[in-house]
Amino acid sequence: MQFQLFSFVLIILNCVDYSHCQANRWRRSKRASYGTNPICKGCLSCSKDNGCLRCQPKLFFYLRREGMRQYGECLQSCPPGYYGVRGPDMNRCSRCRIENCDSCFSRDFCIKCKSGFYSHKGQCFEECPEGFAPLDDTMVCVDGCEVGPWSEWGTCSRNNRTCGFKWGLETRTRQIVKKPAKDTIPCPTIAESRRCKMAMRHCPGGTRTTKKKDKKNKKKKKKLLERAQEQHSVVLATDRSSQ
């Protein structure tokens, strides 16, 4: 009887050891399969169908999407279009939501814009904002040439005169308040003119009226001289015929 009981205990112990060994063997084979699967590189836990579920410390969890399928990866750094967010449980890659941004530093700060766009204060622009100038070699916006407000329109004049003509030009100006960051950056125009109608077309006792009168007097004198010459010619012809 004692012998039978002893044999039964040995059988149970062998079964327990065998089950434990089998479990350990299964865990080792599972870890080995994780290690050989490239999807599971750097994972703390991994699924054959979904890839990494948890990452090792200092790595970032990135959810890759290919068509209808998605699976997790553990990366040293996030891919373009994503930025790393460190958390107490696991570091993750979050998608950059800034328009026309290729690489983000944070949710609202872009460090590299897509081709053809200028970077300015963490945002991407097709054209630099007002007051800033583009640098095409680095595709960034820098301080441009800052100018002050326009002055009032000046007096309407022509040939430095404010009368004597129907139309003239009036001009306004503005000053450069801050020079640009680089000498190659042009400043906007600081003076502009436009056509205007003069307040006084005729100058009071002006030269323009006097010139017109002088021309008329010259014409009258010329006509009188021509008439006198004609009359003198007629008189001479009459005297000759009478002789």
From Swiss-Prot:
Q: In UniProt terms, what function does this protein have?
A: Activator of the canonical Wnt signaling pathway by acting as a ligand for lgr4-6 receptors. Upon binding to lgr4-6 (lgr4, lgr5 or lgr6), lgr4-6 associate with phosphorylated lrp6 and frizzled receptors that are activated by extracellular Wnt receptors, triggering the canonical Wnt signaling pathway to increase expression of target genes. Acts both in the canonical. Wnt/beta-catenin-dependent pathway and in non-canonical Wnt signaling pathway. Activates neural markers and promotes muscle formation.
- Residues in domain TSP type-1? 144-204
Question: Where do the FU repeats lie?
Answer: 90-134
Q: Which N-terminal residues, if any, form the signal peptide?
A: 1-21
Task: Report what the protein is called.
Answer: R-spondin-2
Report the domain of life of the source organism.
Eukaryota
Return the CDD domains for the record.
FU (cd00064)
- Please report the organism this UniProt entry assigns to the protein: Xenopus tropicalis (Western clawed frog)
Alphabetical GO CC annotations of the entry are: extracellular space; lysosome
The UniProt keyword set, sorted, is: Developmental protein, Disulfide bond, Glycoprotein, Heparin-binding, Secreted, Sensory transduction, Signal, Wnt signaling pathway
Q: Where is the composition biased (Basic residues)?
A: 209-224
**PANTHER family per the UniProt record, alphabetical:** NEUROHYPOPHYSIAL HORMONES, N-TERMINAL DOMAIN CONTAINING PROTEIN, R-SPONDIN-2
Region Disordered: start-end pairs: 202-243
- Protein's gene: rspo2
Pfam families under this entry? Furin-like_2, TSP1_spondin
State the disulfide connectivity: 40-46, 43-52, 55-74, 78-93, 96-104, 101-110, 113-124, 128-141, 145-187, 156-163, 196-203
About its domains, the entry says: The FU repeat is required for activation and stabilization of beta-catenin.
**Reported consequences of knocking out the gene:** Mutant animals exhibit marked forelimb and hindlimb amelia.
